[in-house]
Each structure stands twice: as C-alpha cells, then as structure tokens.
A protein has these predicted regions:
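Conserved N-terminal segment of class I S-adenosyl-L-methionine
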Residues: 1-124, 130-134, 147, 213-214, ...
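A short His-aromatic
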Residues: 135-139
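Short, glycine-/aromatic-enriched active-site segment of Class I SAM-dependent methyltransferases
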Residues: 166-188
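Conserved beta-strand signature within the Rossmann-like core of class I S-adenosyl-L-methionine
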Residues: 158-164
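Conserved catalytic loop of SAM-dependent methyltransferase domains
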Residues: 118, 207-235
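A short glycine-rich, Lys/Arg-flanked "PGG" loop and its adjoining helix->strand segment in the class I
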Residues: 144-156
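Short alpha-helix
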Residues: 189-204
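Conserved Class I S-adenosyl-L-methionine
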Residues: 240-259
Length: 263
C-alpha cells in the first residue's frame, strides 16, 4: 500500500469517527439528562451574543421567518425577543419537537408549518422583517429558488441572517487533496468559499453587510462533540478557545455567519 493510500485511509477513518461521534453526542445530551430532546451540545450553551449571534439583529417589533427551523431551537429564542415567528421545515418529527417546546413560551407568538423547501415557501410576499436561515442552504439542491423565495418574503429593507459552512479550511483542503469527501456533513450538497457565497447571494438579490466569526475548524470536532454531551462546562471552554482561534485565523472559520441585506 502506498503512502498516499495509507494517508487517505487514516484521514477517512477520522472523518468516519467524527460523523459517528456527532450522532452519539446528540443522543447523549438526552440520555444524560441535559435536554428533553435529542440536540447537539452547541444548542445547550448559554444565550450569549456569541452563541446566538443572530439574536441582536431581531428587533422587538419584528415579524421573523425561520426557514429550515428544525426543532425550533432558534425560532423559540427569537420568539422571546420579537413580535411573531413563523418556522417552516420539511421534517414532521422536528416540527413536533418545535410545537411541544413552544408551550414554554410566555406568549403564543410562534407558529410552525411543514413545507418542501425545494419547492418554495408557503408564505405571503413582503410579510417578514427578518428571515433566519441557519445551517440549511448547504442541504438544498434548488438554492436559487429558495433564496429567491426568501427575498420575496421580506419587507422592503428586510434582512436575512444566514449561516453556511466554509469549504476552504486547512482541514477540509487536506481531505480534498487525499481524494476524500471533505464536507462537514454527508448530507451537504455544497460548501462555500466566501467568494462563492457572495456570488450566489448576489445572483439572488442579496449582499453581505457583516460577517461574524464562527469557530476554528479542527479534525478533533468529534471528540469535542462527545465532551459536550458529557460536560457542558468543559465544552464551553473548548468552544471559547475555538472562537479565539477563529478570530485570529479567519480563513480557518468552520463557516460563515452573515447578515445579508436584500438589494
């Protein structure tokens, strides 16, 4: 076996282990009593500006659309700060979790609907001040349609709060050079460089007005996820260290947190 094949086998084993560790960590957060639902440990950190960067862009009188809301984690945090939230997702299971969790809101200002996001959005045009679209775009085939639909749903002067993965980190480039699938999730249809993201947004009527740092990309992510499922205190310190590294090395950010204005 050549050195290249050995290197590829080792790197492939790391990717496989990271994917399995992430799934296990999500289950352990519930099994260890940290959450009533199966959630990633990152969603159990405190509600600080860095953990939930988008909340500072949600105005008290805003009407918010959460596209790809999943289990409603972000929808419900926004609902505690704004006038009204609508969440849409294609998973009936996740929407069930969101509906159950919404019972804890101080007022019933969140609604959830099922939708095939590959086919558009079942909402009126010009209705929303803000659209949240977090960790979704990379899972969608028909991204131009979805972005056009998001643009249609916004009021004049509205904004989209977007997060997508960065494909240009050192770790991902190393995987790609070895001929391996380098995306951070097996279901991702695309990951972006900043230039690619800007071009896709511009094509669909958006521009980036501000970028927030995320966390430093690392091949140790699976181990870090498992730590989070067992000790949130240690996970918090590791996450803070990854944020410091991301600020120091912007090209190594695991993703892009972007505030996008409709043109």
């Amino acid at each position: 076996m050549t050195l290249r094949r050995v290197r590829g086998a080792v790197l492939g084993s790391v990717v496989f282990a990271n994917n399995k560790a992430k799934l296990l960590a999500i289950r352990l957060t519930r099994w260890t009593g940290k959450s009533r639902e199966y959630v990633h440990p990152k969603h159990l950190l405190g509600e600080s500006e860095e953990n939930y960067w988008y909340l500072s862009y949600v105005a008290p009188d805003a009407s918010v659309l959460d596209v790809g809301c999943g289990n409603g984690m972000h929808s419900l945090k926004a609902a505690r700060r704004c006038r009204h939230v609508v969440g849409v997702d294609g998973s009936m299971y996740s929407l069930g979790v969101a509906l159950r969790s919404s019972r804890d809101l101080p007022s019933p200002n969140a609604a959830f609907f099922a939708a095939d996001l590959e086919q558009g959005l079942p909402v009126q045009g010009g209705r929303f001040d803000t659209v949240i679209c977090l960790d979704l775009l990379e899972h969608v085939h028909n991204r131009d349609l979805l972005l056009t639909e998001i643009r249609r749903s916004l009021k004049p002067g509205g904004s989209m709060l977007l997060s997508v993965p960065n494909r240009g980190t050192s770790w991902k480039r190393r995987l790609a050079r070895a001929g391996l699938f380098s995306y951070s999730d097996p279901d991702h249809k695309i990951e972006y460089t900043l230039e690619e993201l800007e071009a896709e947004l511009a094509r669909n009527g958006f521009r980036i007005v501000h970028l927030h740092p995320t966390v430093y990309d690392t091949p140790l992510i699976g181990a870090i996820d498992l730590v989070g499922s067992l000790s949130l205190g240690l996970y918090r310190r590791l996450t803070e260290a990854r944020r410091r590294l991301a600020r120091a090395y912007p090209e190594e950010n695991a993703g892009f947190f972007a505030v996008c204005a409709a043109k």
